[in-house]
Amino acid sequence: MSNNTVTLVRRQKEDYWQWLFKLSFFVLWPFGAFLYALKDAASRSSYTIFFLFGVIFCWHMNPTNLDRYDDLIGIMETVIYSDYSFSDICNQVIDYFNFSEDAPKELYNNLLIFISKSFSLNPHLFFAIAAVPYLIFMLKSLKLITDDSKFDKSIYCLIILALFVLPRDIITVQNPRFTTGVWIAVYATIRFFQQRHYSLKYFVMIAITPLIHSGFWFYLPLFIGGLLLRHYPKLTIWLLYISVPFSYMSYEILSTFDYSLLPPFLSKWAENYMNEEHFSKYVLHEGGSGFYWVARIAAIIKTTVYLLVPLFLWKYKDNPQVKKEHGSLLQYYIYIYAAINFIQFVPVLGERFMWIVQILSAYLIFKIIYPRDKKLIIWLLIGCSYFIFRRYFYGGAVSSSVPLNVFYNPAPSLILDFWGVTGY
């Protein structure tokens, strides 16, 4: 039975009453409806609930701890104090493509602000609107897993979905540019390599990601490099082996290097990332928890477990079915993993693009290994457990960025909480 047939059967089983129950449940308790939807995550009605909960969750974003997660505060202030007309946006687009000195680094954020403030001055509307493109591409990517005939209602499949989404989860919409770019890049990359012949459509999708976040000017040549190396699988696996030590290299070692020996444009970029202020903000997380060494050990464990993934996957490279359906993506994954390992010492940049690797890791584990071998799924969950705990339970991003009544109040109450607000 083909994947499409399986999907059709699943959708046909959904009747009017199932839709009515889930939507009514959502009105009464959005988070409860979200949890219930996970029971049948592949269904159309469940995807509708995922989408609606994502929008209402982002509408409800509001800083609860002003000393942490200043991305949300900064974006809110930008939304509140920025005012763009249609003419302003058009001029920014022209300046951007003319490479003018005063052109914005990217266009996406200002466009979102313009659209949002065309309807209301409420900054919460900005996050609700920003959630829409994020959710479209995240859920389209997720559907590439749930539409597979192997996907079932087991705990292993739910763990795979979690590992797939967690690197760039819904809370990251607090700064929507990079996280939206990630899911566009992930979706377009997977679909590009799924095609029998390489697709211009999906390449263009990757090519427009720098308009969303300027950091994707790094990903675009990286992607093209992967295409150039597609006929050299042995080279890519050797690059991965060579890159492994770099994945453990710390800022403390590399910050002592003399970057002035590099070409001017590279030295300026490196010194910017390596200066003490940048390190304190993004690496030490000053003002946060003092369990520094616990976090470092947990990071080493997580890095090690993820490094096992390509080694497990590589064993299946000569399997005829794997080679036919996933061979091109597997080789690209090995290549991009190696390339990003080489820049792990760079604060922010290395971590940002490692999120794409982690998402692809979960996808390929499901497509290539599951269900014949399930232990790697558990290892990954254990390797990520400390960071899941810190993010969702120990004063992390969720409790600092979203009032916790989003998890127990009904939908009308959550909407009214920030109705008519013009500040934070």
For each of these PLM feature ranges, what is it?
Residues 185-200:
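Membrane-interface transmembrane helices that cradle and orient dolichyl/undecaprenyl
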Residues 44-92:
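Extracytoplasmic loop-helix module adjacent to an early transmembrane segment
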Residues 69-88, 218-351, 396-424:
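Alpha-helical transmembrane segments and terminal signal-anchor/GPI-anchor hydrophobic tails
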Residues 73-78, 89-121:
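Short hydrophobic/aromatic helix or loop-helix immediately within or flanking a transmembrane segment
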Residues 200-224, 341:
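Membrane-interface alpha helices of multi-pass inner-membrane proteins
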Residues 129-148:
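Transmembrane-helix motifs of polytopic, lipid-linked glycan transferases
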